[in-house]
């Protein structure tokens, strides 16, 4: 048997930064090569890999994780990932994992969008940490960040050793050039970059802003559907993973790492995006939120928001997630004799919300695209006074379509602690609480 025989022909699909090619499915075992025959046949680590490449395994879970949950990829690259000079710490206080600088607050909090950054701010320099819990030590919890950038990364590359990155663009497209291929992502799409995968970010529109959820814990997965059945919510076929693509580029470059809550830099003499072929199930992917199959009530009452769950990071407690990524997409509301917007609520979980476009149906004003809100554990929240009055008198015999909107939520089991930047930000709306002060007393014991 010739162990270096070419791989199956369907593994070779040419791709380029200008024309990314994708593979469909969530968590699949993919096999892809940018040069024909670059994937070894019948084994992972041959004595001599095709084209003089190096074989390297990238492990996203423990070797002994159950097969259904085991995540790893074999990469065939021009140089191993170990080839760079030593890392040195970067002195900065914007992108980090310190969630204990200021006390967590039981108040309802809301922020306006970040201001435009200074000229020449790339994706990494444009990230600012807003809140989080847990940390990379315990491998649980999340960091919540906002980004605003106006320059592409050219001589810089980045990877995150602390967690996987869920990227939610709000304005401007992103071109994510990764070790395992290229993703073009626009607002109303999301992307997930696995822990450890190196990448750089180009800005096709010249500027971009959005949100990041840094998942320190179990890898994001699709939720079980239970009695919904075998289809619904985010369908696996709509998740797209890139085909192999590489660049063979030498120069004086910088590799930035987020490790143990801090940023580090190392000089590197070549582009680390030099993976010519790969196979496995640990890879970046994107998803179009507009394809979400929304489930709702067609009789009465607004169901729990768990019906809007896109991705989850499970915890060690069955039925309790460490992180939920939830969206509130365009949808028809048909519930009769019911209050149709999301109801008033106090939650054991903590909720960080963002708005990609439009108006959130529980807030008539003040919550704008690019902004954010935080309602922590057992903090009362819900529709503002204007929304309540309008929805309380709406004609519920007729269906109504919520259109041109997309809000989302990072919901966590742990208290979400704002950073000093967020707590002292000029974007913090000091009078957010006033949106509920107009809720009138309607109680009349003589009138049922």
UniProtKB/Swiss-Prot annotation:
<dbReference type="Pfam" id="PF20510">
    <property type="entry name" value="HgmA_N"/>
</dbReference>
<feature type="binding site">
    <location>
        <position position="360"/>
    </location>
    <ligand>
        <name>homogentisate</name>
    </ligand>
</feature>
<keyword id="KW-0408">Iron</keyword>
<comment type="similarity">
    <text>Belongs to the homogentisate dioxygenase family.</text>
</comment>
<dbReference type="InterPro" id="IPR011051">
    <property type="entry name" value="RmlC_Cupin_sf"/>
</dbReference>
<keyword id="KW-0828">Tyrosine catabolism</keyword>
<dbReference type="InterPro" id="IPR046451">
    <property type="entry name" value="HgmA_C"/>
</dbReference>
<protein>
    <recommendedName>
        <fullName>Homogentisate 1,2-dioxygenase</fullName>
        <ecNumber>1.13.11.5</ecNumber>
    </recommendedName>
</protein>
<dbReference type="Pfam" id="PF04209">
    <property type="entry name" value="HgmA_C"/>
</dbReference>
<dbReference type="GO" id="GO:0005506">
    <property type="term" value="F:iron ion binding"/>
</dbReference>
<comment type="subunit">
    <text>Hexamer; dimer of trimers.</text>
</comment>
<feature type="binding site">
    <location>
        <position position="381"/>
    </location>
    <ligand>
        <name>Fe cation</name>
    </ligand>
</feature>
<dbReference type="GO" id="GO:0005737">
    <property type="term" value="C:cytoplasm"/>
</dbReference>
<dbReference type="InterPro" id="IPR022950">
    <property type="entry name" value="Homogentis_dOase_bac"/>
</dbReference>
<comment type="function">
    <text>Involved in the catabolism of homogentisate (2,5-dihydroxyphenylacetate or 2,5-OH-PhAc), a central intermediate in the degradation of phenylalanine and tyrosine. Catalyzes the oxidative ring cleavage of the aromatic ring of homogentisate to yield maleylacetoacetate.</text>
</comment>
<keyword id="KW-0560">Oxidoreductase</keyword>
<feature type="binding site">
    <location>
        <position position="381"/>
    </location>
    <ligand>
        <name>homogentisate</name>
    </ligand>
</feature>
<dbReference type="GO" id="GO:0004411">
    <property type="term" value="F:homogentisate 1,2-dioxygenase activity"/>
</dbReference>
<keyword id="KW-0223">Dioxygenase</keyword>
<feature type="region of interest" description="Disordered">
    <location>
        <begin position="1"/>
        <end position="26"/>
    </location>
</feature>
<keyword id="KW-0585">Phenylalanine catabolism</keyword>
<feature type="binding site">
    <location>
        <position position="345"/>
    </location>
    <ligand>
        <name>Fe cation</name>
    </ligand>
</feature>
<comment type="pathway">
    <text>Amino-acid degradation; L-phenylalanine degradation; acetoacetate and fumarate from L-phenylalanine: step 4/6.</text>
</comment>
<dbReference type="InterPro" id="IPR046452">
    <property type="entry name" value="HgmA_N"/>
</dbReference>
<feature type="active site" description="Proton acceptor">
    <location>
        <position position="302"/>
    </location>
</feature>
<keyword id="KW-0479">Metal-binding</keyword>
<dbReference type="InterPro" id="IPR005708">
    <property type="entry name" value="Homogentis_dOase"/>
</dbReference>
<feature type="binding site">
    <location>
        <position position="351"/>
    </location>
    <ligand>
        <name>Fe cation</name>
    </ligand>
</feature>
<dbReference type="GO" id="GO:0006559">
    <property type="term" value="P:L-phenylalanine catabolic process"/>
</dbReference>
<dbReference type="InterPro" id="IPR014710">
    <property type="entry name" value="RmlC-like_jellyroll"/>
</dbReference>
<dbReference type="GO" id="GO:0006572">
    <property type="term" value="P:tyrosine catabolic process"/>
</dbReference>
<keyword id="KW-0614">Plasmid</keyword>
């Amino acid at each position: 048997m010739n162990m270096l025989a070419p791989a199956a022909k369907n593994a070779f699909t040419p791709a380029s930064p200008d024309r990314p090619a994708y593979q469909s499915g969530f968590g699949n075992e993919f096999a892809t090569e940018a040069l024909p025959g670059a994937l070894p046949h019948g084994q992972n680590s041959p004595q001599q890999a095709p084209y003089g490449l190096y074989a390297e395994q990238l492990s996203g879970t423990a070797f002994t994780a159950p097969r259904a949950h085991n995540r790893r990829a074999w990469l065939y690259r021009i140089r191993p990932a170990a080839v760079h000079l030593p890392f040195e710490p970067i002195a900065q206080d914007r992108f980090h994992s310190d969630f204990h600088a200021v006390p967590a607050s039981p108040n309802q909090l809301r922020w306006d969008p970040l201001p435009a950054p200074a000229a020449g701010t790339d994706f990494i320099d444009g990230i600012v940490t807003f809140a989080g819990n847990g940390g990379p030590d315990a491998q649980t919890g999340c960091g919540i960040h906002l980004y605003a950038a106006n320059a592409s990364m050219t001589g810089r590359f980045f990877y995150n050793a602390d967690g996987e990155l869920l990227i939610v663009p709000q304005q401007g497209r992103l071109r994510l050039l990764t070790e395992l291929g290229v993703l073009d992502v626009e607002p109303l799409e999301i992307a997930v970059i696995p822990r450890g995968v190196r990448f750089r970010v180009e800005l096709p529109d010249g500027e971009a802003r959005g949100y990041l959820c840094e998942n320190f814990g179990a890898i994001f997965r699709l939720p079980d559907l239970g009695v919904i059945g075998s289809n619904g919510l985010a369908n696996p076929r709509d998740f797209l993973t890139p085909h192999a693509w590489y660049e063979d580029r030498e120069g004086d470059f910088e590799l930035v790492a987020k490790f143990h809550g801090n940023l580090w830099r190392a000089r590197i003499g070549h582009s680390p995006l030099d993976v010519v072929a790969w196979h496995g199930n640990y890879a970046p992917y994107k998803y179009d939120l507009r394809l979400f199959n929304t489930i709702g009530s067609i009789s009465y009452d607004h169901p729990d928001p768990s019906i809007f769950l896109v991705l989850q990071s499970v915890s060690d407690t069955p039925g309790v997630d460490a992180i939920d990524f939830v969206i509130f997409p365009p949808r028809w509301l048909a519930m009769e004799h019911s209050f149709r917007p999301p109801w008033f609520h106090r939650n054991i979980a903590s909720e960080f919300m963002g708005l990609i476009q439009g108006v959130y149906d529980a807030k008539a004003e003040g919550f704008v695209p690019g902004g954010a809100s935080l309602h922590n554990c057992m903090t009362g929240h819900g529709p503002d006074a204007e929304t309540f009055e309008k929805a309380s008198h709406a004609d519920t015999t007729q269906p109504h379509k919520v259109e041109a909107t997309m809000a989302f939520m990072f919901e966590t089991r742990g208290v979400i602690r704002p950073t000093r930047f967020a707590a002292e930000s000029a974007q913090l709306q000091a009078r957010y609480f006033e949106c509920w002060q107009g809720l009138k007393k309607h109680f009349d014991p003589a009138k049922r």
